[in-house]
């Protein structure tokens, strides 16, 4: 049964975004410009923040909302009452099953329309979440049946971007990270829990095939670093060819991508925000496409930015492509030149275009609801 709370004579559609990540976090980084660009004549945008951290990105994000509420210390019933008092038409969960999530609220029908977006790479399994925002590369038609939500298909990549993101105005050098200028640098800045034995086997094979190469990873903790070094030794790879860099501000982190030659994605849980960062920085990324949401995000980004040739279908294909590119300087340079052009021309980093398409989706589902129509798959062209 549709829950008819929307009033047809409202001047604006009221959108409520719920997140614990309105800060210098992957979700905050990806959504900030989308929130800023929303058409405030058509939409009232309200933020519901489930954390107490406030940083430079929180300040920027808060300015994009007409109202901003910290719900960290509010029980569910209070949050539900607040959203009803504010007349929220569409509630959007940006967390899913992630840290400090309030996704449990979405098990209740507290808003007329409820959407899962961006934070969790898969179905929520919650019957009161009506829609999931995706794209055709991410969820092919044959896979719709595995989702409890109806799919809102955006025309390009489902992932928003921040074209205004800050990058430090400072030259970085490889020597700062214990990397030599003449080394071929593969990198993977995905978090350590995405690195499994099979993908590490691939990396070892690639390192073995490419002399004077290293793989550059992000520090997580001493235990994971020790384990990865040990796994390298077991595969007869010099552990010094596994190089780690410390966590730092997003502004400096993005700059570091420019020091690498080629990004090697993980599988089956691939790069999401890190893929966005790499491509934005001009660094090509090789991925393996799978069937699950989390194994198709990087493929969606690569397709949108016109680099489908970097999408592989197997571990063997992934290894061979990485080795082939690393051995062929001219081919790598050609890929990087195409990427540089496509950063400017493809829809991936055109935030205004992205926002307009998402708003078309919001208007579409809002009008369907007002016409007493049940949620259905939505295709935005």
Residue ranges and their predicted role:
Residues 264, 278:
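Donor-sugar nucleotide-binding helix/loop cap in glycosyltransferases
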Residues 95, 265-271, 289:
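Short Ser/Thr-rich beta->loop micro-motif in glycosyltransferases that lines
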Residues 279-280, 284, 303:
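Short alpha-helix at the nucleotide-sugar/activated-sugar donor binding site of glycosyltransferases
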Residues 105, 206, 277, 301:
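Hydrophobic/aromatic ligand-binding patch that stacks against planar heteroaromatic rings
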Residues 11-14, 180-187, 213-214:
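Charged active-site motifs of nucleotide-sugar-dependent glycosyltransferases
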Residues 1-178, 191, 201, 230-236, ...:
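Alpha-helical solenoid repeat scaffolds of the TPR/TPR-like class and their adjacent stem/linker regions
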Residues 295-306, 311:
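Short acidic/histidine- and often glycine-rich active-site loop of Leloir-type glycosyltransferases
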Residues 42-46, 204-234, 239:
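A conserved nucleotide-sugar
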